Structures are given as structure tokens and as C-alpha cells.
Amino acid sequence: MSIPRVGVLALQGDTREHLAALGEAGAEPMTVRRRSELDAVDGLVIPGGESTTISHLLCGFDLLEPLRARLAAGLPAYGACAGMIMLASEILDAGVRGRQALPLRGIDMTVRRNAFGRQVDSFEGDIAFTGLDHPVRAVFIRAPWVERVGAGVTVLARAGDHIVAVREGSVLATAFHPEVTGDRSIHRLFVDIVNGKA
């Protein structure tokens, strides 16, 4: 199979780290800021950042509805932290009216923004991750958690009692930031999903 072209939504957030991780994981990474770039990718990463800002910029760049349409048509996607929030079908504590995080509805789940607390409450630790043969180093920065999953959603990881990684079909989401750890397991898993191998 040819090397998949995987985009990173480059409107706000830690784009550079995901581009590097995808390259190391065997993909051809590219930034996505325009509809033509979105149309050219085989998969998309929605990075961490600020979900209300990303939502505002998706609207400003006329990408919100095209992205929702591509997800509905089966585009493989991976969301980390704010990206997990964006991929939800429902967002709790979505923000003030007119400046809210807007759900892309890629995964049938309810996510609570900033559930683990403020920036000073950020933490990291090793967690078990279904499908991987080793624990994953998880860095949580003002992280969300999943409060509800639909019947078709697989829970991949928990931190304590809280769901922090899920998958539905070809859409993957984590509440943590694997791109900052040097462990490329999650990005390799996503590249395999894009290639139809996982």
C-alpha cells in the first residue's frame, strides 16, 4: 500500500509535534487549513489546543461543515485532548454562547471539557491501552474525559475511573497528548487505521 497522506488541522494547537510524530509513524504528513487540503488527505489529526478557538476558526475558514461531511462519509480521524472534545457528538461545559466548542460528531460520545481541572492540575502517568502491548505515557493538560459512549464505541484506556481513550470505526480519540512523549504507538495505530490494517 502507498504511504497515506495524513493531515493535521493547523488552525491552532500543537501542529508541529503531530506532523513529526506522523512522519515517524510512516505517514506523509501535511497541514490542513483549507478545503482543498482537507479534500486531499486520507486521514486527519485534530490536535490539542483550545476547543472553542478551534471551533471559531473552523467556522472562519469555512471548514466546519466540510469536515463534518467528510467524517460522516468515513474519513479516518484522530483527536488529542481538544481534538477529542471536537470529535464528540455532545460537549458538556462547551463554553459561553457565541464562543462554544462545536461538536463534529465523529464519535458517539459525551465529553466534558477541562474535566481534570485547570492548567496547574495537569499531570502525566503510564496507562494501559487496549491493543498495545505496553503502557502508554499519557500527558494530561487541562484534559477532558468521556462521560458517555454509544454502543458502537470501544473504550481503549482509562485514568482511574475516567474514560480517556476511545475508538468508533476509523475515528480515534485520546484525552492526553502522545505527541509530546516520544512514544509513537498511538500515531502508528492511527496510521494503521488509515491504511485499513487496524
From Swiss-Prot:
Under the heading Gene3D superfamilies, the entry gives: 3.40.50.880
Listed as disulfide-bonded, the cysteine pairs are: none
> What SUPFAM superfamilies does UniProt report for this protein, alphabetically?
Class I glutamine amidotransferase-like
InterPro entries per the UniProt record, alphabetical: Class_I_gatase-like (IPR029062), PdxT/SNO (IPR002161), PdxT/SNO_CS (IPR021196)
**Known EC number(s)?**
4.3.3.6, 3.5.1.2
Q: Which residues bind L-glutamine?
A: G49, E50, S51, R113, I141, R142
What are the alphabetically sorted keywords of the record? Glutamine amidotransferase, Hydrolase, Lyase, Pyridoxal phosphate
Q: Name one GO molecular function term.
A: glutaminase activity
Entry annotation: catalytic residues: C81, H177, E179
Q: Which reaction does it catalyse?
A: aldehydo-D-ribose 5-phosphate + D-glyceraldehyde 3-phosphate + L-glutamine = pyridoxal 5'-phosphate + L-glutamate + phosphate + 3 H2O + H(+); L-glutamine + H2O = L-glutamate + NH4(+)
Q: Sorted alphabetically, which Pfam families does this protein's record hold?
A: SNO
GO CC terms:
cytosol; glutaminase complex
Q: Which GO terms describe its biological process?
A: glutamine catabolic process; pyridoxal phosphate biosynthetic process; pyridoxine metabolic process
Listed under subunit, the entry gives: In the presence of PdxS, forms a dodecamer of heterodimers. Only shows activity in the heterodimer.
Task: Please state which protein family the record places this protein in.
Answer: Belongs to the glutaminase PdxT/SNO family.
Q: Which NCBIfam families match?
A: PLP_synth_Pdx2
Describe its function: Catalyzes the hydrolysis of glutamine to glutamate and ammonia as part of the biosynthesis of pyridoxal 5'-phosphate. The resulting ammonia molecule is channeled to the active site of PdxS.
Q: Write the protein's name.
A: Pyridoxal 5'-phosphate synthase subunit PdxT
Question: From which organism does this entry originate?
Answer: Mycobacterium marinum (strain ATCC BAA-535 / M)
What is this protein's gene name?
pdxT
